């Protein structure tokens, strides 16, 4: 369910704003989106897994807060990230 190290490193390379960037909002949102997509698929198969459901809701809330921060501080980066990830905000 969690993103593998290899996949996480691929995401970091793809969304990093500079060399060694692992903490920018874009990277964090991209990794959370991958996690959310994996958990969503898990929940489709295991609908009674309430512990994973709570974790999914927490990750969605964290991503929402990061996106809100980016929207308030840099609208162009926000719009570019939403387009790259294909989110419906």
Swiss-Prot record:
GO cellular component: cytosolic small ribosomal subunit
A Pfam short name: Ribosomal_S15
Any one Gene Ontology BP term: translation
Coiled-coil annotated spans: none
GO MF entry, a single one: rRNA binding
Taxonomy, superkingdom: Bacteria
UniProt keywords, alphabetically: Ribonucleoprotein, Ribosomal protein, RNA-binding, rRNA-binding
Entries under CDD domains matching the protein: Ribosomal_S15p_S13e
Description of how the protein assembles with itself and partners: Part of the 30S ribosomal subunit. Forms a bridge to the 50S subunit in the 70S ribosome, contacting the 23S rRNA.
Family statement: Belongs to the universal ribosomal protein uS15 family.
Purpose of the protein: One of the primary rRNA binding proteins, it binds directly to 16S rRNA where it helps nucleate assembly of the platform of the 30S subunit by binding and bridging several RNA helices of the 16S rRNA. Forms an intersubunit bridge (bridge B4) with the 23S rRNA of the 50S subunit in the ribosome.
Protein name: Small ribosomal subunit protein uS15
Protein's organism: Lactobacillus delbrueckii subsp. bulgaricus (strain ATCC 11842 / DSM 20081 / BCRC 10696 / JCM 1002 / NBRC 13953 / NCIMB 11778 / NCTC 12712 / WDCM 00102 / Lb 14)
Gene: rpsO
């Amino acid at each position: 369910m969690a993103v593998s190290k290899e996949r996480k490193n691929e995401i970091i390379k793809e969304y990093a704003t500079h060399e060694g960037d692992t903490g920018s909002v874009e990277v964090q949102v991209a990794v959370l989106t991958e996690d959310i997509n994996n958990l969503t698929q898990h929940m489709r198969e295991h609908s009674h897994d309430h512990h994973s459901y709570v974790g999914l809701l927490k990750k969605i809330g964290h991503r929402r807060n990061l996106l809100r921060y980016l929207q308030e501080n840099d609208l162009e980066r926000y719009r570019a990230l939403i387009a790259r990830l294909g989110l419906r905000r």
